[in-house]
Amino acid sequence: VGGVADLDDKLLDEVTALNEWPVPIDGTFEEDFLSVPPEALVATMKGHQKYFPVFDKTGGLMNHFITIANLESQQPEVIREGNERVIRPRLADAKFFWEQDGKHRLFDHIQKLEHVVFQNQLGSMFEKSVRVAALAADIAEGIGGDPKLARRAGELSRCDLMTQMVVEFPEMQGIMGR
């Protein structure tokens, strides 16, 4: 397919343990899904479907994956089509959440953090963000950085927790806020 599969050791061990006669089969998905951050697509492929994503020589995610069948089929295209059909709704979900979250600024989520407990004695995630923002500004000032920019980064640092993408794909925490 012109790329290299990400043969994650942990996933490879898991997949080979699940299959008595492992046979790799390549599959594809619509290129339109590549508009979603690659981390979300990879999380879907590896975490939810146990597929190996394929990357091009520059490290960009391709619209290909490798799945492992449990037999040498006389009709591998049937297995391929079945796996392509299974991943499509999961990728569509990721795309939907990405597009919905894109309709709002990240900062729009900050007030929702008031309803998320960080720790009983330490308050909410909102209060933690306020403390982190103040600390970041102080540190930036002390090292000759931009305190205003550091404060803003601290304020935004937890906002992605309230995005639909992170609610659906918790492993995207810290990535969606970029």
PLM regions with names:
Residues V1-R178:
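Amphipathic alpha-helical "coupling" segments that flank catalytic cores
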